[in-house]
């Protein structure tokens, strides 16, 4: 991988660590705070790698914190999946695993502190009134409850906590600046009433802190030095700093924002991905067409390819969209170096070598990976009857066709012999059911004894008498539109009806019969494939195409 210069986040950290800097002499301490209301996707992966990778680069530490302050859609299923995904990518949080909800008591105490300082008040504007009184760029916001006495605020807030009021009756708001040009500073809501069971706290709490209040407090309580987050929180940073500076937290983290990752031909909104799952438009969160990490893993993506992708696109302040083909390019690079080669015939037709002795078979040595001299060779059986791709034979060839056709040029069977097509056999409907050819017994290994030039192509094959049957799933982009998330489009209407093709009756090298997930292979001429981790089983092999051989990424 090419050398990557320091990004702007690292430049800020260098300034903070320098003598006289904000965190001089301190250990860099970051955190990754996913909300456990869905599965991590490739967009989260960029943030994850920035958080864990930055700490790793500076010899620091990174916490994993479940941001579970909103109880509406959070579930332990997602908590477990998030941990699995992070470990799969090669990162570890050690003993620094936390839940935002574990700080509810402390967060409540800080809210009381703000009330006592005259910096927070209980407001009873309804959501509709809140919008009405919020003002605009020329007119300040208004709240008739802003000057409520401190003692009354304390009493009402405690009664909110005790469950004495219905949802929406009261909120706790910060008292900052109703005329601020930054609407996030116009007395934002800090707490709201919600009667909903929390996945960890149960029904202990009926008031829940807003993200903008809870997040800086959680960072400070964990002694985070650098709170790295996506760019939409840039306008929230003044509020983050206001909270940190107005409650008695033990540390003062610095928030730094970076641009989110956008990729064409996909959507990364959890809400939109959830709809695909709930409406059965995909098979689940781990559908290999999904941008979730569990989906990418099932499709055959490797941790190295995803980390390489995120590291090479870099860290920016300006949002941009990356080509999905670049992610494929990174996977292709990784698998080209490491995946074992194998032969698989996906749309088979029988090839009979008429001058090969009946009942005879032999074993040929074929290389496992030409890019890895230490990968060695494997034994592949060969006999009179083989399976080849149906497209490797044409009864009437088109111009420049160099594969098998009657009286055409010699072709090379990969690692085996030279053959020459002599004809074909058809069924009563005129379908080709068998290709006929002769072989040169002196060309074992694929090279003629007399050194003559082979004008035909090299094709792959499988021994029809010693092979494994499999189902093969060919995946392509879930969306046919490069920008399905555009504001003027219904992303559901952009779904690609040809994003999955299922092939049955495929013929594979016998050694693949024992392959198990997460084994990955390059099927010669076909692409890179992996064993499906969910549906494949002994006696019912299922392989997923991770990526095609052809690289469409424009370097």
Map each language-model feature to its residues.
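Long, charged, mostly alpha-helical binding arms that flank functional sites
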Residues: 251-330
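Active-site cores that bind ATP or allylic diphosphates and position pyrophosphate for catalysis
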Residues: 64, 68-70, 113-273, 331, ...
């Amino acid at each position: 991988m090419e050398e990557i210069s320091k990004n702007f986040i690292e430049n800020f950290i260098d300034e903070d660590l320098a003598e006289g800097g904000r965190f001089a002499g301190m250990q860099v301490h970051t955190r990754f705070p996913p909300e456990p209301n869905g599965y991590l996707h490739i967009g989260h992966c960029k943030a994850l790698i920035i958080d864990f990778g930055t700490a790793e680069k500076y010899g620091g530490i990174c916490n994993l914190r479940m941001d579970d302050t909103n109880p509406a859609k959070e579930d332990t299923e997602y908590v477990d999946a998030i941990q699995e995904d992070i470990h799969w990518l090669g990162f570890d949080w050690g003993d620094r695993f936390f839940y935002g909800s574990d700080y509810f008591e402390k967060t409540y105490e800080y809210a009381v502190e703000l009330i006592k300082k005259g910096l927070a008040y209980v407001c009873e504007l309804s959501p509709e009134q809140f919008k009405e009184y919020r003002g605009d760029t020329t007119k300040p916001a208004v709240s008739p409850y802003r000057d409520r006495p401190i003692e009354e605020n304390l009493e009402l807030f405690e009664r909110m906590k005790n469950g004495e009021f219905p949802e929406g009756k009261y909120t706790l708001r910060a008292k900052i600046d109703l005329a601020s040009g930054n609407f996030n500073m116009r007395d934002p809501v800090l707490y709201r009433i919600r009667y909903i069971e929390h996945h960890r706290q149960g029904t202990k709490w009926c008031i829940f802190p807003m993200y903008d209040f809870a997040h800086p407090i959680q960072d400070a309580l964990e002694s985070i030095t650098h709170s790295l987050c996506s760019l939409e929180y840039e306008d929230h940073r003044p509020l983050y700093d206001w909270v940190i500076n107005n409650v008695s937290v033990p540390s003062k983290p610095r928030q730094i924002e970076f641009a989110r990752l956008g990729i064409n031909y996909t959507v990364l909104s959890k809400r939109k991905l959830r709809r695909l799952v709930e409406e059965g438009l995909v098979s689940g969160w781990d559908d290999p067409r999904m941008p979730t990490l569990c989906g990418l893993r099932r499709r055959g993506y490797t941790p190295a390819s995803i980390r390489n992708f995120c590291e090479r696109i870099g860290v920016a302040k300006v949002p941009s969209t990356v080509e999905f083909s670049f992610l494929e390019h990174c996977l292709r690079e990784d698998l080209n170096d490491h995946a074992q080669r194998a032969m698989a015939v996906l749309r088979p037709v029988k090839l009979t070598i008429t001058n090969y002795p009946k009942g005879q078979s032999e074993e040929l040595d074929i290389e496992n990976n030409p890019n890895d001299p230490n990968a060695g060779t494997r034994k592949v059986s060969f006999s009179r009857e083989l399976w080849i791709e149906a497209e490797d034979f044409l009864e009437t060839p088109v111009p420049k066709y160099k594969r098998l056709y009657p009286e055409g040029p010699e072709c090379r069977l990969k690692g085996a012999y030279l053959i020459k097509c002599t004809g074909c056999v058809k069924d009563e409907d005129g379908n080709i059911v068998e290709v006929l050819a002769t072989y040169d017994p002196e060309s074992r290994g694929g090279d003629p004894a007399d050194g003559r030039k082979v004008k035909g192509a090299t094709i792959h094959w499988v021994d029809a008498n010693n092979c494994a049957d499999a189902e093969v799933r060919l995946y392509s982009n879930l969306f046919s539109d490069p920008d399905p998330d555009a504001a003027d489009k219904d992303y559901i209407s952009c779904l690609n009806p040809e994003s999955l093709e299922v092939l049955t009756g495929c013929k594979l090298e016998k050694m693949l019969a024992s392959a198990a997930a997460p084994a990955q292979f390059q099927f010669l001429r076909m692409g890179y494939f992996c064993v499906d981790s969910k549906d494949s089983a002994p006696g019912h092999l299922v392989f997923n195409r991770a990526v095609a051989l052809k690289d469409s990424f424009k370097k």
